[in-house]
Regions:
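Motif-centric detector for short Cys/His coordination patterns
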Residues: 18, 23-29, 87-95, 100, ...
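Acidic, low-complexity, intrinsically disordered interaction modules
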Residues: 66, 72-103
Length: 129
């Protein structure tokens, strides 16, 4: 089954997955933003919504929205990786993603679901299981 998602739905899935997926770090995949990128994204969010409490994931999504990509690094493969909104929208339409998307949208998700969604956004498939 192919699921067609809006840009906002894709960003929400990525946000929720970032909140719940510590498993990528266990696979050697780490976020790789700079302090400057983080500070600029946080400043933009605080300017837009000064009364809103921010979490790390809000800022990471703002980096993705503002710069067009969220950088990662594969410490084992020594490779730069990234999520782009366009690539995530394309990859999340693959049949393999459907089960994980539905689990998250229905509240039946966990760290494994979140990791699978991020892997699909980055690699186009679940790599680490």
């Amino acid at each position: 089954m192919k699921i067609v998602l809006s840009k906002e739905e894709v960003l929400e899935l990525i946000h929720n997955s970032l909140c719940n997926s510590s498993m990528l770090a266990q696979c050697g995949i780490q976020l790789k933003h700079t302090k400057e990128q983080y500070a600029a994204a946080k400043a933009r969010l605080l300017e837009e919504t000064p009364d809103k409490g921010l979490c790390l994931e809000d800022v990471w999504i703002e980096i993705l929205k503002g710069e067009g990509k969220l950088p990662f690094y594969d410490t084992e493969g020594e490779e730069d990786l990234e999520i782009t909104i366009e690539k995530a929208m394309e990859n999340l339409q693959k049949e393999e993603a459907s089960e994980h998307i539905l689990d998250m949208q229905n509240g039946n998700d966990d760290a494994i679901t979140a990791s699978a969604i991020l892997e699909i956004c980055i690699y186009g498939e679940v790599v680490f299981g």
